[in-house]
Amino acid sequence: LFPYTTLFRSKYCRFDAPEASGGYYTQDDIRELVNYARERHVTIIPEIEMPAHSEEVLTAYPELSCSGEPYKNADFCVGNEKTFTFLEDVLTEVMELFPSQYIHVGGDEAGKVAWKTCPKCQKRMQDEHLANVDELQSYLIHRVEVFLNAHGRKLLGWDEILQGGLAPNATVMSWRGEQGGID
């Protein structure tokens, strides 16, 4: 999700956390990369994976998962308001570091299995009149899109963001073939 140092690490994670592994880019490293790319007329589009591919985050912050336990599945709990606070904090910092008009949110390969039995996700589905877990994913993507648009950015995602209804201003990248981008 974020292999670079963040302004809010003290709020969410310590550098010496036992779950931490691997290297990271500092904010200065990111700025240097962005400037290097800009000098060559290249735009770096950051990708912050959601709702799936989030094992690292959910191991460090199990309260953002449906189980509330360290890594049981790879999807954020969409019924948990803390998930949105976390994602908005991450996206705010990403927007400060990357000037790209697009922010890629992934949106692919969400398992959605835990959402079917998660009380918070089921309540969100009931409160928002969502028929199924595909629409729950669409709810997350749409809500993130509204946040990004309010900050002058555009949402970019893989073709699975089409499932459950497309957010109005989203741009879709099809990785599963042409048909996914056409449908």
Where do the PLM segments sit?
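Substrate-binding cleft/loops of secretory-pathway carbohydrate-active enzymes
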Residues: 60-64, 113-114, 156-183
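Substrate-binding cleft of carbohydrate-active enzyme catalytic domains
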Residues: 1, 5-153
